[in-house]
């Protein structure tokens, strides 16, 4: 049975969890099978910046980092569920969240 794979990325964990809960609510409302949310490892991007060059050639570095939280949700395909997901304002226009949808045909949920 084909299914829809939703990958969600965000730097804000609370916003990510809110979107995941909204997706779970829509799926529960329509009654289709769902697997997930599966938390993926957090990606940490580090940027070292030379703050000052100290006395006698010593260097002082600052390190800035950004954490990217990721989740995967698999949903059995249903026209009604997909329409509800696409029309939900929380899903369609997030500011800090990126969402990827992928239709997979040959795998069982």
From Swiss-Prot:
The keyword Zinc does not apply. The gene is rps10. Part of the 30S ribosomal subunit. This is Small ribosomal subunit protein uS10. Keywords: Ribonucleoprotein, Ribosomal protein. GO terms for biological process: translation. Involved in the binding of tRNA to the ribosomes. SMART domains: Ribosomal_S10 (SM01403). NCBIfam families: uS10_euk_arch. SUPFAM superfamilies: Ribosomal protein S10. Belongs to the universal ribosomal protein uS10 family. One of its GO terms (cellular component) is small ribosomal subunit. One of its GO terms (molecular function) is tRNA binding.
């Amino acid at each position: 049975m084909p299914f829809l794979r939703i990958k969600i990325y965000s730097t804000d964990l609370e916003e990510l969890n809110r979107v995941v809960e909204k997706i779970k609510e829509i799926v529960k409302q329509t009654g289709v099978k769902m697997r997930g949310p599966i938390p993926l490892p957090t990606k940490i991007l580090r940027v070292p910046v030379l703050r000052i060059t100290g006395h006698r050639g010593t260097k002082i570095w600052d390190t800035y980092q950004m954490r990217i939280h990721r989740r995967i949700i698999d949903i059995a395909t249903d026209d009604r569920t997909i329409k509800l997901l696409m029309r939900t304002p929380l899903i369609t226009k997030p500011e800090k969240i990126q969402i990827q949808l992928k239709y997979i045909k040959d795998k069982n949920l």
